[in-house]
């Protein structure tokens, strides 16, 4: 996901990390997050220029490039750290994201209900350097074919 958002026009900053764990005072490690006991989700922090890119466009890209219908799973990766989540920093972002998910479910945009967690951001910690550059080529190819108009 980090590799995708780095290519989006209007995105200013992207970094991989961990969001919304149970112990928000202690920075988690990848090994700790993988135990499934920290409550943290693997996440990508995205800072964007709203005058160049609408939040709904970011949401469209997010939902088109992962499976938001399987709880605590992405592909072969299983565990609460792999949950689909949107963690917002403002009440407006929260309302937009909640409305977007509700509309996806109302429109039956996916073969199963969207189970993406939408919540205020309570904590974000950057991932260790070795975990920040993983790229999944098929995901990037899907993005470039569907969202060429949004690319830098």
Segments (PLM) and residue ranges:
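Flexible coil/turn and secondary-structure edge motifs
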Residues: 1-152
């Amino acid at each position: 996901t980090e590799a995708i958002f780095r290519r989006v026009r209007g995105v200013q900053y992207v970094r991989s990390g961990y969001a919304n764990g149970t112990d928000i005072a202690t920075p988690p490690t990848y090994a700790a997050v993988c135990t499934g006991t920290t409550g943290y989700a693997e996440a990508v922090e995205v800072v964007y220029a709203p005058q160049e890119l609408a939040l709904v466009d970011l949401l469209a890209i997010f939902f088109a490039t992962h499976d938001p219908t399987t709880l605590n799973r992405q592909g072969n990766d299983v565990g609460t750290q792999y949950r689909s989540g949107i963690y917002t920093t403002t009440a407006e972002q929260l309302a937009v994201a909640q409305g977007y998910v509700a509309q996806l479910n109302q429109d039956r945009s996916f073969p199963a209900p969207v189970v993406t967690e939408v919540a205020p951001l309570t904590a974000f910690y950057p991932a260790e350097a070795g975990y920040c550059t993983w790229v999944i080529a098929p995901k990037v190819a899907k993005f470039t074919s569907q969202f060429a108009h949004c690319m830098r």
